[in-house]
Amino acid sequence: MRRVDPVTGLVLVLEGEGNLHVRSPRGEPVRDIAPPEGFSFSHFAGPGAVLVCRGEREIEGWRDWQFEVDAAAGTLRRVAPAW
C-alpha cells in the first residue's frame, strides 16, 4: 500500500505489519519507520498520512489506534481510536 504525505510529498510504502518505508517522490529511500512499541501496522486510514496500528493490549479501552505519520521526522503520533 502506498500513500503520499500531503505535507512533504514523500511517499509512504506499507509492507506487512512491521515495515513502513519512506521514499522521495522519485522513489529513493529516505528512511524506515518501525511501528510503535506494542503495535503492528495494519492499513492507511483517511486521505492523509495516517496509519491504523493494532495493539497487543488495550489502551483506554481500544486495541486499534490511528497514528499520524511525520514522514520528514520519521515519527508517529497516536491521535485517535480506530473504528
Place the predicted regions along the sequence by residue:
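Repeated scaffold domains used in trafficking and secretory/extracellular systems
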Residues: 1-7, 35-48, 81-83
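Short beta-strand elements that form the blades of beta-propeller/WD-repeat-like
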Residues: 2-15, 47-60
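Residue-level detector of beta-strand structural context in well-folded domains
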Residues: 10-11, 40, 67
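Acidic, proline/glycine-rich low-complexity IDRs
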Residues: 61-83
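A structural detector for beta-sheet-dominated domains
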Residues: 14-15, 36, 54, 70, ...
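Aromatic (tryptophan-biased) beta-strands that constitute blades/sheets of beta-rich domains
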Residues: 22-37, 77-80
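Structural motif
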Residues: 17-23, 59-68
